[in-house]
Amino acid sequence: MKNTLFRINELSKKEKATGLTVDEKQEQQMLRQNYTQTFRGSLDSILLNTKIVDQNGLNVTPAALQDAQIRLKLSK
């Protein structure tokens, strides 16, 4: 993922400085799309394994998140 982000930034700098070729522009779009999918997947994984508890020890996880967690457990 670090290499992908490095390449995205490298292409962005080049785009600002001199512009990109058609191939580089396609590569940039593909890298950004892949990076976004990976990032969202990681965030989903983190959220689906999160439980929110108030200072009294009560589970205050939002209902929508609890529903998603239940659906995930049922699909496994």
Curated annotation (Swiss-Prot):
CC annotations in GO: cytoplasm
Localization per record: Cytoplasm
SUPFAM superfamilies: YnzC-like (SSF158221)
Superkingdom of origin organism: Bacteria
The keyword Ribonucleoprotein is annotated on this UniProt entry: no
Gene3D superfamilies for the chain: Helix hairpin bin
Record protein name field: UPF0291 protein BA_1897/GBAA_1897/BAS1759
Species of the source: Bacillus anthracis
Lineage per the UniProt record: Bacteria, Bacillati, Bacillota, Bacilli, Bacillales
